[in-house]
Design a protein with these regions (language model features):
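Conserved Rossmann-fold NAD(P)-dependent oxidoreductase catalytic core, especially the SDR/UDP-sugar
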Residues: 28, 95-98, 103, 119-163
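NAD(P)-dependent short-chain dehydrogenase/reductase
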Residues: 149, 169, 173-229, 265
Length: 333
């Protein structure tokens, strides 16, 4: 993959299908919560796909993200989305992404977690009731299912574990309420989980193998999707918005074994993984058959990601320093 510039280019590269979808959008796109892990890359991908105007909104407590977005051609607005006056002052647009969310550090900050994950999305949908809205939620709203299964489907019952997951389900319920009340077309996207070379479960496992650290097998299976694929899918979702709100799982097609990831990484790195514990019979997994049926297959699969990741780690590539906590079964992050 090379350096971070090459990584960013790959993550923000629009597919032909994305270019076609963006060409059909007849107005400005607003990205709320554009300063997180996915926001800056989504904004750049939309611009590269030909979007005439993309406005990125965040508190931008880290000026690096705002500078980056200004450089790639976005219009940036610094705003606290929990401030009603600030939210109402944002421009009227026909297309909105809601990416704002609070996961890591949520334990001990429960009030902020619920405000960000539940109250804020509902207020955003109310504010943009005349727009089409892609709302990014989480697969954590589902219960654990058998590791041998294909994962939870969109129509399956939810049963969130822990306050983070509960707050995400709360956000979904209030967004659905606002969508139904105002006839606002929305798609709620349940992500399990975006991965790139500086962050993600594959990154965590490969890094631990390389450094000789223990790898906990208690959460023995997981889904991952290359972040570039996730962003391309999201850029094509506005036609899928509906009222009542539609729901779509966003993840890769493979159920990955943490043990197998570690063992394959060990072979490629020439190191023996240090595995501890045993796989539980259940894991947090999502079924993406509906996604593939509507929007097609991912472009990047696990084997390709693993090869890139091993090279990245061996060459000392930078990490975001944000462990996923994939092994946690308590729902506390």
């Amino acid at each position: 993959m090379g350096d971070e510039a090459a990584l960013t280019e790959r993550l923000t590269r629009p597919s032909a299908a994305t270019r076609q979808a963006v060409a059909l959008l007849d107005g400005e796109i607003l990205v709320l919560g554009a300063g997180g892990k996915m926001g800056p890359n989504l904004v750049e991908l939309l611009i590269r796909a030909g979007a005439p105007r993309v406005t990125a909104v965040s508190r931008f407590s880290d000026s690096v993200h705002r500078d980056y977005l200004d450089t790639v051609g976005a219009h940036t607005i610094a705003a606290d989305l929990l401030d009603e006056t600030a939210l109402q002052s944002l421009p009227d647009v026909p297309y909105v992404f809601i990416l704002a969310g609070y996961k890591f550090g949520s334990t001990g900050n429960e009030e902020a977690t619920w405000a960000t994950n539940t109250y804020l999305p509902a207020r955003a949908v109310s504010r943009y009731r005349d727009a089409r809205i892609v709302y990014l939620s989480s697969g954590n709203v589902y219960p654990f299912v058998s590791g041998d299964s294909a994962g939870s489907r969109e129509e399956d019952a939810t049963d969130p574990v822990g306050e983070y997951a509960q707050s995400r389900l709360g956000g979904e319920r209030l967004v659905a309420f606002e969508s139904k009340c105002h006839g606002t077309p929305v798609i709620t996207v349940r992500l399990f989980y975006a991965t790139e070379l500086r962050y993600g479960i594959i990154h965590d496992v490969v890094t631990r193998v390389h450094q000789g650290e223990t790898i906990d097998l208690s959460m023995g299976h997981a889904n991952q999707i290359w972040q570039g694929d996730a962003l391309n899918y999201m850029a094509r979702m506005f036609p899928l918005c509906a009222s009542p709100a539609a729901v779509l799982n966003l993840t890769g097609t493979e159920v990955l074994s943490v043990r197998a990831i570690a063992e394959q990484a060990g072979v490629l790195l020439g190191k023996e993984p240090v595995l501890v514990g045993e796989e539980s019979g259940t894991a947090l997994l999502g079924n993406c058959e509906r996604l593939v049926e509507v929007l097609g297959e991912c472009e990047v699969g696990f084997e390709e990601i693993l090869g890139w990741m091993v090279d990245w780690v061996k060459e000392g590539g930078r990490s975001l320093g944000k462990p996923t906590g994939y092994e946690k079964r308590s729902g506390k992050f």
